[in-house]
Design a protein with these regions (language model features):
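Active-site micro-motifs of SAM-dependent methyltransferase domains
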Residues: 117, 136, 167
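Conserved N-terminal segment of class I S-adenosyl-L-methionine
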Residues: 1-132, 141-147, 151, 206-213, ...
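Short, glycine-/aromatic-enriched active-site segment of Class I SAM-dependent methyltransferases
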Residues: 159-187, 192-198, 219-226
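Conserved SAM-binding loop
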Residues: 92, 137, 160
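Short catalytic micro-motifs in class I SAM-dependent methyltransferases
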Residues: 132-139, 184
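Short glycine-dipeptide loop
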Residues: 152-158
Length: 259
């Protein structure tokens, strides 16, 4: 494994530059479709807001690859794939059967399961692979990234979004950090740990930042309530309302494979 591990959220700051593993290396049975919102109950109700944000993500990706074959790992209900479809030949992999079935009803090519050798072989080589808020959920992120790299065409790109364990927000909040949510999140990454994994696989980091995102107000409320130890609500009338948010604790990383 390219990254090293800490043993507790209170580890020293030097350790925060490395990947941190929660000792629960299994996929929770209660994981929400796509795993994108830590059990957030109204993912489908937030479709208008999410698709607006995903449209921005597509525009960003096209700076690095304007067209070609695109795979979204952990595609949930396919909202990102819908936005990418005008520019790419899209496919997805989704662990939740209900969400994957929904995608297929929208004429999206989505396989149910993990991004394993079997599913990736069925889909074939890709020019773009996205793991949007997914890597932290996986039992073996290094192995998944290695498989994705194998099925990435020369010169292709991988887009990763995940929490930044070295961020100021993570340091200040500690165990109450909004993204410190075991068992949904099994791994916590820093830029250094992602760079180590990527370099070992022959990938180079082409871009890194902490972008602003348009987030459903209901998700903001959900995370605040959870951080305060309050009972989280289900669906909300504010799911369709978006709010620009940036706590500078979520990374966006573009990796490129050598041509």
């Amino acid at each position: 494994m390219a990254a090293t591990f800490c043993s507790a959220p209170s580890a020293a700051s030097a350790e925060r530059r490395r990947a941190f593993l929660i000792p629960a290396p299994t996929i929770p049975a209660t994981i929400s479709p796509g795993g994108h919102a830590d059990g957030y109950a109204d993912y489908r109700g937030a479709e208008p807001v999410l698709r607006r944000e995903f449209a921005n993500t597509v525009d960003f990706i096209r700076k690095y690859r304007a067209s070609g074959r695109l795979l979204d790992v952990g595609c949930a209900y396919g909202f990102f794939l819908q936005e990418a479809r005008p520019y790419f030949d899209v496919a997805g992999i989704e662990i939740a059967e209900e969400a994957a079935t929904f995608c297929r009803k929208q004429s999206l090519r989505v396989l149910t399961g993990m991004a394993d050798e079997y599913n990736l072989a069925q889909l074939g080589m890709m020019d773009v692979i996205t793991l949007l808020d997914v890597l932290e959920h996986l039992p073996s992120p290094h192995e998944t990234l290695a498989l994705c790299t194998r099925y990435l065409s020369p010169g292709g790109v991988i887009l990763i979004t995940t929490g930044d364990f070295a961020s100021h927000s993570a340091r200040v909040a500690g165990a109450r950090w909004r993204l410190m949510t075991p068992p949904q999140h099994l791994w916590y990454f820093t830029l250094e740990s992602v760079e180590r994994m990527s370099h070992a696989l022959g990938l180079r980091v082409e871009w890194y930042d902490h972008p602003w995102k348009i987030v459903p107000i209901s998700l903001v409320a959900f995370q605040i309530r959870r951080m305060l130890g309050m009972r989280t609500a289900g669906t909300s009338t504010t799911s369709g309302v978006g709010l620009p948010v940036n706590l500078f604790d979520a990374m966006r990383i573009v990796l490129r494979k050598s041509a």
